Swiss-Prot record:
Signal peptide: none annotated. It comes from the Eukaryota. Residues 211-356 are annotated as: Disordered. It comes from Dictyostelium discoideum. This is Probable DNA-directed RNA polymerase I subunit RPA43.
Length: 356
């Protein structure tokens, strides 16, 4: 949601007035939520411009009025969801210029400058160098006081000052003033509402003086001379109190601390501890070794017994194999002998047949 100033037409050209009325043509981009009511969309857009600095106008927009929609229908460009439309509007613009006389109400006083509010909203400042030399800053009351007339500049004082410089940033402007010209600038009144609003925030504390203690010292030093007087401020609740006893104690030289008891030296035999630890470690290692040996011997015995069992079984298997082999050989021999005998008988029969 954006706005762009297309053209500016100043209607009034005042010489000494810091407000200027301008007729402006604006190009607005309204979001899709304002499709049902374009008037409410333009109003919310213009409300965002109020009390903001615009470089095209050269000042701060104070108010707007006479809004006219020049387009009957809103336009949508390409694939943008925003609604484009043009309007004419009148702006009241605050445009201070150099050497102009403005009135402001003091909202803060410090040793370096005075801060003011112009028309209740716009900030301005007057540095100490631009304040008349007859005014001096009083730390006890936190205000500038005229030595001759006893006039004071405090929170809530109305001042007429001359504009020296106007600096602008993105949204605001800063005004720097001067009140050394006594013919056109100076104190013009007091605003009690502003003093109640800002006065309690910037009180400076004063150092309290204990009356009894210093009066005694003063009487002893002056020997009856009553030229110096001290004000008793113990009953004043608005003044913060500071203790001077702590300052005196800090000025005194520190007393040395004497230690009567001799420090005891604690001897630690690190080697003996190490030896003990080693012996314990050796004992534990021996025990572990013995246990390991026993376990290994048991394992060996088991393995040997298993091996012996296996060897006996192998022997039995081998013997059975040999017996089987021998029996198989004998059977084969018998078969051969029988086969040979049969063959011989056959031959004999054949011979007989031939003879016949």
């Amino acid at each position: 949601m954006t706005s762009k100033i297309v053209s500016v037409n100043p209607l009034i050209k005042p010489v000494e007035n810091c407000f200027e009325e301008m007729k402006v043509q604006l190009s607005l981009q309204l979001p899709p939520m304002d499709t049902q009511s374009l008037c409410s969309g333009t109003k919310s857009m213009l409300d965002r411009l109020v009390f903001k600095y615009k470089t095209e106008l050269g000042g701060i927009i104070i108010s707007y009025y006479d809004v006219i929609h020049t387009d009957k229908e809103a336009k949508i460009f390409y694939d943008s969801p925003y609604l484009g439309m043009n309007i004419h509007v009148k702006f009241l613009v605050f445009k201070p210029f150099k050497d102009q006389i403005l009135n402001g109400v003091v909202k803060r006083v410090s040793t370096t400058h005075i801060s003011l509010l112009v028309f209740g909203t716009i900030s301005a400042s007057i540095p100490k160098s631009n304040i008349p030399k007859s005014f001096a800053f009083d730390h006890s009351s936190n205000m500038f006081m005229n030595k001759q007339t006893k006039a004071t500049i405090s929170v809530g004082t109305k001042i007429a000052f001359k504009v020296i410089d106007v600096s602008a940033d993105r949204h605001n402007i800063g005004i720097q003033g001067d009140m050394t010209d006594l013919t056109s600038t100076g104190i013009i009144g007091f605003d009690e509402n502003q003093s109640l609003q800002f006065g309690s925030q910037y009180e400076t504390p004063n150092k309290n003086v204990k009356n009894n203690k210093y009066n005694n010292n003063n009487n002893n030093n002056n020997n009856g001379n009553n030229n110096t007087t001290l004000i008793n401020t113990e009953n004043n609740n608005n003044i913060t109190k500071f203790d001077d006893d702590s300052e005196k104690e800090s000025e005194e030289e520190p007393k040395p601390i004497i230690i009567k008891e001799e420090p005891k030296i604690v001897s630690v035999k690190v080697e003996s501890k190490k030896v003990v630890v080693k012996e314990e470690e050796q004992k534990s290692s021996k025990k572990d070794k013995d246990i390991k040996k026993e376990k290994e011997s048991k394992k060996r015995k088991k393995d040997s017994s298993d091996e012996s069992d296996e060897s006996e079984e192998d022997k039995k298997k081998k013997s059975t194999k040999k017996e089987k082999e021998s029996s198989s050989k004998k059977s084969s021999k018998k078969v051969k002998v029988e086969s040979s005998s049969e063959s011989s008988e056959d031959e004999k029969e054949k011979k007989k047949k031939k003879k016949k």
